A protein has these predicted regions:
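Conserved class I S-adenosyl-L-methionine
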Residues: 1-5
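Class I SAM-dependent methyltransferase "Motif I" SAM/SAH-binding loop
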Residues: 6-10
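Conserved SAM-binding loop of SAM-dependent methyltransferases across substrates and taxa
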Residues: 11-21
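Mixed-charge (Asp/Glu-Lys/Arg
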Residues: 14, 24-215
Length: 215
């Protein structure tokens, strides 16, 4: 059994899995855990493991948001495979919590701004703010991830932003996605992602017999 109590970017866990060892990895940040999950899934397609300590439902997400808003932001950003903005730094983010890169024509890379709100009260002003950030940053789209359900005026304001025409179809420029939506498998509608957004781990040889680990 390999125990890595500070698994960070997952190098030790990756090596243990490649060698067919049982392992347990521990980290205090949801950002690190989500990146390790992605690394393992890329390197070992079909791998099975358990993740403990991350929200499994809306109530769990609300508890995380109440305990630590930054951990909630990093966790929520990982659910839409966005690149965390500013890494693990805490503080002013200019209205940007994550970035999603995509290729609207299959060649040129563009971006969507992700804004996360874990509070119980959300308002139309937050959608207007996201629209301003999208314009300021030269982004093509914006995604508003919220724990609380959006209000009618928020939905109306998002609709006013119009649509983004791409070679792969038409997409709403501003989209509101709730945590409940994400748990139901309903994420933002976007053009094909840019595979270079995250550095992908190379696939490993699956010929070795492996045992089911825990994370």
């Amino acid at each position: 059994m390999v125990l890595d109590p500070f698994c960070g970017c997952g190098t030790t866990i990756h090596a243990a899995q490649r060698l067919g060892r049982r392992w347990i990895g521990i980290d205090v940040t949801h950002l690190a855990v989500s990146l390790i999950e992605k690394r393992l899934n890329d390197a070992f397609p079909g791998i099975r493991y358990e993740v403990h300590g991350t929200p499994k439902d809306v109530d769990g997400a609300a508890a995380l948001a109440a305990a630590d808003k930054y951990q909630f932001q990093w966790w929520a950003v990982s659910l839409v495979d966005a690149v965390p903005y500013g890494g693990k730094r805490k503080g002013a983010d200019g209205g940007i919590d994550g970035l999603i890169y995509f290729k609207p024509d299959g060649r040129t890379t563009e971006k969507a701004i992700v804004s996360v709100k874990g509070g119980t009260n959300v308002s139309v002003a937050m959608i207007r703010d996201l629209g301003h950030v999208v314009e300021r940053e030269g982004a093509k789209m914006g995604v508003f991830l919220t724990l609380a359900p959006p209000t009618g005026p928020m939905l109306t304001e998002a609709t006013k932003a119009g649509f983004y025409e791409t070679a792969f179809g038409t997409f709403p420029r501003l989209q509101i996605v709730t945590v409940a939506d994400l748990f139901q498998g309903k994420g933002p509608r976007l053009p094909p992602r840019d595979a270079k957004s995250f550095r992908r781990a190379a696939k490993e040889d699956q010929s070795l017999e492996r045992q089911t680990p825990l994370l």
